[in-house]
Regions:
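Polybasic, proline/glycine-rich intrinsically disordered low-complexity segments
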Residues: 105-138
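Conserved short "hinge" loops at termini or chain/domain junctions
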Residues: 1-65, 127-134, 139-153
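Divalent metal-cofactor coordination and adjacent catalytic microenvironments
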Residues: 31-108
Length: 153
């Protein structure tokens, strides 16, 4: 059974707020989020499913992804979003948000907070990825560390 990209997008959209997305059409949102998919796939290097088995025209993976796999992929997409929109862009230094609810008093402090948030997301997702890898090893009957014996002197 196939997994549509839309499942990833739905999971991802609930994790962040963007001022641009409400102004976009559904197709524009899909195109925008699709840009974060390929880097997310390359980061998910221990996936037990073949993430390259996909149809970009039909916007789906040709395999069924579990909820954990969808969560890991959408988290990596979120990290890619933060990287591209905030971390790797010089426009961060020219922040002009019209919202009266959110004011930036120090761009340097704001950047520090963004970097801390980014690091937190990466750490949390790497932990989830490690658990996913361990679950796969356990399900496969692989005994990690088996066969290695310390010699006593």
């Amino acid at each position: 059974m196939a997994t549509p990209y839309e499942k990833l997008y739905e999971n991802l959209l609930s994790k962040f707020r963007s001022y641009e997305i409400p102004l976009m059409t559904v197709e524009e949102v899909k195109d925008y989020l699709y840009d974060f998919l390929a880097p997310a796939i390359s980061r998910f290097h221990v996936c037990r499913k073949n993430l390259n088995d996909r149809d970009d025209i039909l916007q789906r993976f040709n395999v069924e992804l579990s909820d954990v796999e969808i969560e890991i992929l959408s988290n990596y997409m979120l990290i890619e979003y933060i990287d591209s929109e905030y971390v790797r862009t010089p426009s961060l230094l020219k922040i002009q948000l019209p919202s009266s609810d959110f004011k930036v008093y120090s761009p340097a402090n704001f950047l520090d907070k963004l970097m801390a948030m980014h690091k937190t997301y990466v750490t949390e997702n790497e932990t989830l990825l490690s658990r996913y890898a361990w679950m796969g090893a356990k399900e496969s009957g692989i005994k990690l560390g088996a066969g290695y014996k310390k010699s006593k002197f």
